[in-house]
């Protein structure tokens, strides 16, 4: 039931986005007729809308664009479609498959005069009279309806020329009759100015924030378009919206789109531009902006970077800043009732804004525009790639799933990086000196999935730019042994990211943290690196000592900041290496700057508990001194899984040696099994050192051989004609034997005993290894309780022994 009510409320919150289906809403289709003034409908649709052949109709497209056309019937057109050619589609700013509305427009006047200008790049090199060759035949006897701002294409004299309607009398639309005067004097219009208006942002250029967009539409469009609704119900329409969220999520873009789509007057105030050195001028700048907007109502005032002009008054030292905040407050209250002025503001630091601004009646709605989820990312990628040439193998869904924590700006950068990579591949065919590039090269360009993969490897989300996250190139194969630990880790990090539905089904939140402990050199850090690489989560590595600074309160702020970043870029793995340096048992350390270390631990503890459950943030700690770590951090709910990573046994040692020598040429007679048998008590790092030394010896021998041969060649050039084989093709037994002479154990038996003891105490404190439910129905227990007993319990116990022994 809950899910049903959820979806219902979800429907209500985005109700404004739904397209209402009315008979005059039609889907745009490609036209067969090349005429610029004609659209065609099916006969049935024309009867339904009571239109006759040759009627003038008004079409409404995107971004408040309209066009006037003549309607004809076309029997091949299906009922819900409307056919129009490219020129009309451009004027309406629509694509094939978009929805437009059509309405009869019976009383279009005949024009007295119209003014049209050609667009410069289509008339280059044309001599002669434009009017005679192009315009006269186009308009002659045609009675074409035109609208101010339209662009139309005229073919004639071997080429096509585009004209723009600059002015019509009567405005805004009229029919060009035989006695209409057509002016075409003046400078041709530059294509760039035209393109700019074409590239205006609309609602369809915004992806990944559907709910927020619905909120903003009902806050902005309803009061501007239908103020009567609010009058009827008897409330004041809202007047301020504060958009906040991390940089790059599209706050300014949304404001632009709203302005374009509502057609309201748009007044942009950049925070810092208002400031002036003269007393009182900054405030009057603000007042002017608001007056200007009120004159041009309905209007939207958009204040970008609000935190620059309205910081908290008690924190600011300058008198001017305080006065500006006060001025803004009085202006927002003093907006006359229903003056149809809406104030929107954007900031990425909502908490540094003066609280008086955030009350109802000023900025009444705060819309959090957060980091998009994978469906949102897919929308954004589709928007950015709709004009790109993609090859067939590009799977945008996969790209969307792999870009955790990316905001819209990062995805745009990702697309352009992939496109650049596609161009780089063709660089050998492109010469920078040439004037033009071959059409063949141009047509063969397409962005492939490999380009996207390359771009993915280059890009990291902007939320994590400061704590630069190098995802390490370590895979599970690089880690020898430790199979159980690997499985445990995969379950911890990958399951919540990949199978969240299972956790919902069983009604549990996934566990948040793991602590690896064990002797140095056993691969604790390596494991954390591998998990960061294998599951597609972001990875932040925190070196303990970096958090502490000399300033009071700064160390704790660092901790808070890191956790905030991780939450923004969820799913994210936070890796604390050398946890013992920042999470020592509290109260014991005398003489450290005012107990800074204690405060850092307190901060970490509260952060781990206060982690909002929605975000997938995992904490992995690694330490080789588990005995001095504060016990509060080891309780379930914080770092609940304590995993002992022991010295490798013989099987693991073979695996480690093999993993180390995966890429090296090793002679057939080197017996790694024997080597593993002999190196009892060696840690993984020690084994790696043996392999490295053997490699080094082989390299040394190889270089000495080359030098010797070079000398011989110089003394006796004729004898050395025959090219010899490589004298040292692989790492031989004697290299390993030599290396073993220097091998040493880094962990003494004494240390091992300490770890075993610690693991043992943990084991004993559990003490429920042989726990069983009673078999019968004792104490009123039903049969359902007994069902869980038996093999399950003993199996559980073996697992535990395996991992922690």
From Swiss-Prot:
Subcellular location: Cytoplasm, Cytosol; Endoplasmic reticulum; Nucleus; Cytoplasm, Stress granule
Entry-linked PROSITE patterns: AAA (PS00674)
Positions of post-translational Phosphoserine modification: 3
Biased composition (Gly residues): 776-793
Activity regulation: ATPase activity is inhibited or reduced by lowering pH from 9.0 to 7.0, and by addition of Ca(2+), EDTA, KNO(3) or by treatment with N-ethylmaleimide (NEM).
Superkingdom: Eukaryota
UniProt keyword list: ATP-binding, Autophagy, Cytoplasm, DNA damage, DNA repair, Endoplasmic reticulum, Hydrolase, Lipid-binding, Nucleotide-binding, Nucleus, Phosphoprotein, Transport
Matches recorded under InterPro entries: AAA+_ATPase, AAA_ATPase_CDC48, AAA_ATPase_domain, AAA_lid_3, Asp_de-COase-like_dom_sf, ATPase_AAA_core, ATPase_AAA_CS, Cdc48_dom2
Gene Ontology CC entries for this record: chromatin; cytoplasm; cytoplasmic stress granule; cytosol; endoplasmic reticulum; nucleus; site of double-strand break
A GO biological process held by the record: interstrand cross-link repair
Protein family according to the UniProt entry: Belongs to the AAA ATPase family.
Binding partners and assembly: Homohexamer. Forms a ring-shaped particle of 12.5 nm diameter, that displays 6-fold radial symmetry. Interacts with the FACT/DUF complex, which includes subunits ssrp1/duf87 and supt16h/duf140.
Protein name: Transitional endoplasmic reticulum ATPase
Organism whose genome encodes this protein: Xenopus tropicalis (Western clawed frog)
Gene field: vcp
């Amino acid at each position: 039931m809950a899910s049903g009510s959820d979806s219902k409320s979800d429907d209500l919150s985005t109700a404004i986005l739904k397209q209402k289906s009315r008979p005059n809403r039609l889907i745009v289709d490609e036209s067969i007729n090349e005429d610029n003034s004609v659209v065609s409908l099916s006969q049935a649709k024309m009867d339904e809308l009571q239109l006759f052949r040759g009627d003038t109709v008004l079409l409404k497209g995107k971004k408040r664009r309209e066009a006037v056309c003549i309607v004809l019937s076309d029997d091949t057109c299906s009922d819900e479609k409307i056919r129009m050619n490219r020129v009309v589609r451009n004027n309406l700013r629509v694509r094939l498959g978009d929805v437009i509305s059509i309405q009869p427009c019976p009383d279009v006047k005949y024009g007295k005069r119209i003014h049209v200008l050609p667009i410069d790049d289509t008339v280059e090199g044309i001599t002669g009279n434009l009017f005679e060759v192009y315009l006269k035949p186009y308009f002659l006897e045609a009675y074409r309806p035109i609208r101010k701002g339209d662009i139309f294409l005229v073919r004639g004299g071997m080429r096509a020329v585009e004209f723009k309607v600059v002015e019509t009398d009567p405005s805004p639309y009229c029919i060009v009759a035989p006695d209409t005067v057509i002016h075409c004097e003046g400078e041709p219009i530059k294509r760039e100015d035209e393109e700019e208006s074409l590239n205006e942002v609309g609602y369809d250029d915004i992806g990944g924030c559907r709910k927020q967009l619905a909120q903003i539409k009902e806050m902005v469009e309803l009061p501007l378009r239908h103020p009567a609704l609010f009058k009827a119900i008897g409330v004041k329409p809202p007047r301020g919206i504060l958009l906040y969220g991390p940089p790059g999520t599209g706050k300014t873009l949304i404001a632009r789109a709203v302005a374009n789509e509502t057609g309201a007057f748009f007044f942009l105030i950049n925070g810092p531009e208002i400031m002036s050195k003269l007393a009182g001028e900054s405030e009057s700048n603000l007042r002017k902006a608001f007056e200007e907007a009120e004159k041009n109502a309905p209007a939207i005032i958009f204040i970008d970077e609000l935190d620059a002009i309205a910081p908290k008054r008690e924190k600011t030292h300058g008198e001017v800043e305080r006065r500006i905040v006060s001025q803004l407050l009085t202006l927002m209250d003093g907006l006359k009732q229903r003056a149809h002025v809406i104030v929107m503001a954007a900031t990425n630091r909502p908490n540094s804004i003066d609280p008086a601004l955030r009350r109802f009646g000023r900025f009444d709605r705060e819309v959090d525009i957060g980091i998009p989820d994978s469906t949102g990312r897919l929308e954004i990628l589709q928007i950015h790639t709709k004009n790109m040439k993609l090859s067939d193998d590009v799977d945008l869904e996969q790209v969307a799933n792999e870009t955790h924590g990316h905001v819209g700006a990062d995805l745009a950068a990702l697309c352009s990086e992939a496109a650049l990579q596609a161009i780089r591949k063709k660089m050998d065919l492109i010469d920078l000196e040439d004037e033009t590039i071959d059409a063949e090269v141009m047509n063969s360009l397409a962005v492939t999935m490999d380009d996207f993969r390359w771009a993915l490897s280059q890009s990291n989300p902007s939320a994590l730019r400061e704590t630069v996250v190098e995802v390490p190139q370590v895979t599970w194969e690089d880690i020898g042994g430790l199979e159980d630990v690997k499985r445990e880790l995969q379950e911890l990090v990958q399951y919540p990211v990949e199978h969240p539905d299972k956790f919902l089904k069983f009604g549990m939140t996934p566990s948040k943290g793991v602590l690896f402990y064990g002797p140095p050199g056993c691969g604790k850090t390596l494991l954390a690196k591998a998990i960061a690489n294998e599951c597609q989560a972001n990875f932040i590595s925190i070196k303990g000592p970096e958090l502490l600074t000399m300033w009071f309160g700064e160390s704790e702020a660092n901790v808070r900041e890191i956790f905030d970043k991780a939450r923004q870029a969820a799913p994210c793995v936070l890796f604390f290496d050398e946890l013992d340096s920042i999470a020592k048992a509290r109260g014991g350390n005398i003489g450290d700057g005012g107990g800074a270390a204690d405060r850092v631990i307190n901060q970490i503890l509260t952060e781990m508990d206060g982690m909002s459950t929605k975000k997938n943030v995992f904490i992995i700690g690694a330490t080789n001194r588990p005995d001095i770590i504060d016990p509060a951090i080891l309780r379930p709910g914080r770092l609940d899984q304590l995993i002992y990573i022991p010295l490798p046994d013989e099987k693991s040692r073979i695996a480690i040696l093999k993993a180390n020598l995966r890429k090296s040429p090793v002679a057939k007679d080197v017996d790694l099994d024997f080597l593993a048998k002999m190196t009892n008590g060696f840690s993984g790092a020690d084994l790696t050192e043996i392999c490295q030394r053997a490699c080094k010896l082989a390299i040394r021998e190889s270089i000495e051989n080359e030098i010797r041969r070079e000398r011989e060649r110089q003394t006796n050039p004729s004898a050395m004609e025959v090219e010899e084989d490589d004298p040292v093709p692989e790492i031989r037994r004697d290299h390993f034997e030599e290396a073993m002479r220097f091998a040493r154990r880094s962990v003494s038996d004494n240390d091992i005993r300490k770890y075993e003891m610690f693991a043992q105490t943990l084991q004993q404190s559990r003490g429920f290894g042989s726990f069983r439910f009673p078999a019968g129905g004792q104490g009123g227990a039903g049969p359902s309780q007994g069902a869980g007993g038996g093999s399950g319990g003993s199996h559980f116990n073996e697992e535990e022994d395996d991992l922690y022994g």
